[in-house]
Amino acid sequence: MPAMPALVPAQPYYCEENAWHEAKRVVEAGEPGPIEVVFISNPARQCALWAQRAAPKPGEPVVWDYHVVVRVGGDILDPDCTAGARLPAAAWLAASFPHGEEIFSRYLPRFRRYPAGQFLMVFASDRRHMRRPDGTHLKPPPAWPPIVARDGSVHTLPAFLDFDTVGPTPWVGLRAFAAALATPGTD
């Protein structure tokens, strides 16, 4: 297989927008699939991931309210991962969740996959979740304009994180997600 183009520029703390741009790039490049956008969270919105650039120290986890990556065939694209921005799924899982499910239950991840084509049409973020009450940014925003859904919606992010909303796939635990990744193209 020929070498794939480099990842698109990414903005720290805006993983959902990074994933949108990366999914768009890989779809347009015609990379073999499946191509999915994967949301990682849990009902407590306290999900521990290791090997993340935002970690307080190397080897320590960062606790995200949510994280978003892109699956391309058997690879995971995660520009926040210190082990590599594009890794085989098993390597990304080992780096990001080195303790498996042997952590406090409140930090256990849940995963929901969205087909990239669907995600690219309906995702939108006006970045309101990244602003303080006075309107200032919690973290510097990306240079690109906010993403607007094809239907003109400006903020659909909450629906992607809702554990009560029916999505294209159910929220699943680490083992089920790893099993789905182990058989690219058959799930």
Segments (PLM) and residue ranges:
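A structural boundary/capping signal
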Residues: M1-D187
